[in-house]
């Protein structure tokens, strides 16, 4: 029987590392707030068209590196490979284009490439 392991390029963050990650995130949040930045959180899953339009249809990211699937209604969704496009979409969709100009974000991003 095949031994089930994490997917290549994906990493478990175990309790000892979670403490470090949390500390760094708290430091980032505190520092960003002092300079007027506001946190934003976007979905991990986005309409694939968002990345095709913003990153470019012929780029390696779109053609080779995104984790994409099509649902039963033929909608194409991708796990976010980067954060800029999702943040821009959220600000526009949320009607915040005239009220917010300094944001920060953190979170997982997904690309099918060799782990570093």
Where are these regions (language model features)?
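TRNA-recognition modules of translation machinery and tRNA-sensing kinases, especially anticodon-binding
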Residues: 1-116
């Amino acid at each position: 029987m095949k031994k089930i392991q994490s997917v290549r390029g994906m990493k478990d963050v175990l309790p000892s590392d979670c403490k470090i990650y949390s500390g760094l995130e708290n430091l980032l949040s505190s520092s960003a707030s002092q300079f007027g930045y506001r946190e934003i959180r976007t979905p991990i899953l986005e309409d694939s068209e968002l990345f095709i339009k913003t990153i470019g249809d012929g780029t390696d990211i779109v053609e080779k590196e995104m984790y994409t699937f099509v649902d039963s209604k033929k909608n194409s969704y991708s796990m976010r490979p980067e954060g800029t496009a999702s943040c821009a979409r959220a600000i526009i969709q949320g009607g915040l284009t005239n009220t917010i100009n300094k944001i920060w974000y953190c979170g997982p991003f997904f690309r099918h490439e060799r782990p570093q």
